[in-house]
Amino acid sequence: MNRRAFIGQSALAAAALSMQGFAFQKQHQIGIQLYTVRDEVAKSVEGALQGIAKAGYDHVELYGYQDRLFFGKTAAQIKALLKQNKLQAHSGHYLLQDMLYNKTYNWDSWKYLLDDAALLQHQYIVIPWLDAAHRTGDDFKRVTERINEGAALAKAYKMKVGYHNHDFEFQKAGNGKTFLENMIRDTDPGLVDFELDIYWAAYAGQDPIDWFRRFPGRFTLWHVKDMSQGPNKQSCEVGKGVIDWKTIFAAQKTSGLKYFFVEQEHYTQPVFNCIADSIGYLKKEVL
């Protein structure tokens, strides 16, 4: 499906959706994926969080966890910085290659992660990426099994495991279904949710609303990332691209949406201006 068809189908879907969703969405806080301001994080985590709070965001989705540290800071230190800026961290992206790929993985490492995530008051531990060398049908099957195992342990911490898509998950697996569809069907719905990156779904020619309808309640997290006009399809400020956000947010109840995170990877102006424009558009035109 090309972008014009995607936009057209979304517009048709809007007519079929009730206005009930717009009342529902006003309950949501506005979050941001911290990776959006990664260059500022590299300069100063403190400054990055201050800039996010100043722009009006309520919570951040963390990234950068390694050896029990975020950018050289402990979970307790990050928690303190979040509190200083009146921010929450309901979710975090965690690159878990060892857990996903290592047949002899020591699950004690997972428990350390759960301890740190609990300290940060996470509700979700999100797996954001699979390496290109680990995307076969067998790889996805093993990853799905590991996600279920990890999620079973996370339940004791009142957390769920999530999986975040790019475009490759929409490729067909050996059984004729997409890898993402197989993952959704083969994970425990009581323990595992999915974070739909709206940009990557559109990039792959998918209609997000179709996925919400096929798997209601499973996409509790979203990445709200817009796609610029033109052939490069780069990300841009929310509201400046081709994605119909009003239509998508009207379907949030079907999706099961709990939290969404603004994200942007390419900039044509200073990043804090970008995130201010995005939240301004959402507050004025969508929420």
Each predicted region: which residue ranges?
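Active-site acidic/histidine proton-transfer and metal-coordination neighborhood
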Residues: 11, 81, 85, 100-193, ...
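C-terminal segment of N-terminal export signals and the immediately downstream linker at the start
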Residues: 21-51
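Acidic/histidine-rich catalytic cores of soluble enzymes
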Residues: 59-60, 155-242, 249
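Acidic-and-aromatic substrate-binding clefts and catalytic sites of carbohydrate-active enzymes
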Residues: 37-43, 63-74, 96-107, 132-141, ...
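Conserved, mostly hydrophobic/aromatic
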Residues: 32, 52, 60, 82, ...
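N-terminal export signals
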Residues: 5-24
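Short, acidic/polar
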Residues: 40-51, 105-116, 207-211
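Catalytic domains of carbohydrate-active enzymes, especially glycoside hydrolases
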Residues: 48-63, 120-121
